[in-house]
Each structure stands twice: as structure tokens, then as C-alpha cells.
């Protein structure tokens, strides 16, 4: 990190797995790394345990995410699903935020269930054909697929950590501390630039 700081980099892109993501944030913080923008594809920073461990050290980082509690991501059935799931998760003592994996996990099974019901089949070919030509209404919005099985329209977005104070979990229950920057249709905040401005 000190070598990167010595180059006075404008942009630092980090692609890392969970424990490395934590280590990179801590090392950058210790080295007082100060590019204009930092982040990228840091696996793990979506997890409550790492958000609360790193706390304010995350301020300013840009990272990918799939679902956050933004008004723009509240589709038909989303709030009812989250209420039910979060109550169960709390009773079980797991998933304190209750929204990183749950909405998409539910939507994936919902889509598969709808395809099986519509085709009355478990045949891979029939299911694949149906999945390719159908748009599904789910708790994560409309889901449709391209020719190769990929999403017809990507749902990965970039979000920026900001305004984190301390290590409490409750501050992560809104987009006040993790704003969706792109894509525009789901945007919940503007990028704070440069990095040091988001650190204040």
C-alpha cells in the first residue's frame, strides 16, 4: 500500500476475496492511501460481519453489490418477503441485515418454480427454452435471460460507502451508509469524489 501511495495514483482498483478485502481496507487505512477513487470487485464487503468489523474504514470505497434497501429496489412483494425473512433470521440469530443474499436466493427459486409449473417438466431443455423467452416478476424485479443464459440486463450495481460512524449494525439497514451510484435507474445517491472527501 505504501508503494501505491508513493505513485500518487488517481484510481486504485481492488479485486479480492473476503479476507483479502478486509486486509486491503485495513492496510490502505494504515498506509493512509489517498487516491481519488478506490474499490471495485471486493468480495465480502457485502457481509454484515465485515461491514461492522471495518466500520468507518470503509467510507469512500466503491464496490459492487446486488441488492440494498433502496426505494428503487422495492418491487411487488419485496417488503413482505423481507419482513418475513428478517423476522425468521432474527429468531435464528443469523443474517442481521437480512438482505444481501436472501432476495436473490428467493427470486432464483421462484423463477425455477414458475418455469417448472408452466412447462410441467423437469427436462433441462424445456426449462431452458421457457426461461429464455419469459420475463418473470420477482421480489428483485423483472428477471429475463439472454441467449447464453446470462441476465438480459445486468443487475450488478456499484455502490459507495459513506457516513459510517462506529461499528454498529443498524446504520447499514438503509442506503444512508451505502448509496447505489449506478445503474441510474436504481441510483440512491451521488458519488462523493474524491475519496478523501468521503473520508471526512
Question: Model-predicted segments: where are they?
Answer:
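Short catalytic/ligand-gating loop segments at beta-alpha or beta-beta junctions
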Residues: 95-106, 128, 140-147
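Solvent-exposed, acidic/polar segments of extracytosolic/periplasmic ligand-binding ectodomains
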Residues: 132-200
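Solvent-exposed, polar/charged alpha-helical surfaces in well-ordered, non-transmembrane soluble domains
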Residues: 2, 6, 22, 26, ...
Amino acid at each position: 500500500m505504501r508503494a501505491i501511495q508513493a505513485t500518487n495514483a488517481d484510481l486504485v482498483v481492488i479485486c479480492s476475496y473476503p479476507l483479502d478485502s478486509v486486509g486491503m481496507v485495513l492496510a490502505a487505512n494504515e498506509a493512509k492511501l489517498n487516491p481519488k477513487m478506490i474499490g471495485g470487485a471486493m468480495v465480502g464487503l457485502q457481509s454484515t460481519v465485515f461491514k461492522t468489523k471495518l466500520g468507518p474504514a470503509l467510507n469512500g470505497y466503491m464496490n459492487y453489490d446486488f441488492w440494498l434497501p433502496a426505494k428503487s429496489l422495492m418491487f411487488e412483494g419485496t417488503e413482505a418477503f423481507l419482513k418475513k425473512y428478517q423476522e425468521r433470521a432474527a429468531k435464528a440469530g443469523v443474517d442481521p441485515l437480512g438482505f444481501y443474499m436472501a432476495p436473490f436466493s428467493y427470486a432464483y427459486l421462484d423463477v425455477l418454480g414458475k418455469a417448472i409449473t408452466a412447462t410441467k417438466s423437469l427436462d433441462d431443455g424445456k426449462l431452458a427454452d421457457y426461461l429464455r423467452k419469459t420475463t418473470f416478476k420477482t421480489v428483485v424485479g423483472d428477471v429475463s435471460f439472454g441467449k447464453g443464459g446470462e441476465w438480459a440486463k445486468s443487475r450488478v450495481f456499484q455502490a459507495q460507502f459513506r457516513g459510517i460512524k462506529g461499528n454498529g449494525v443498524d446504520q447499514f439497514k438503509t442506503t444512508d451508509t451505502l448509496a447505489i451510484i449506478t445503474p441510474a435507474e436504481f441510483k440512491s445517491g451521488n458519488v462523493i469524489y474524491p475519496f478523501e472527501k468521503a473520508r471526512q
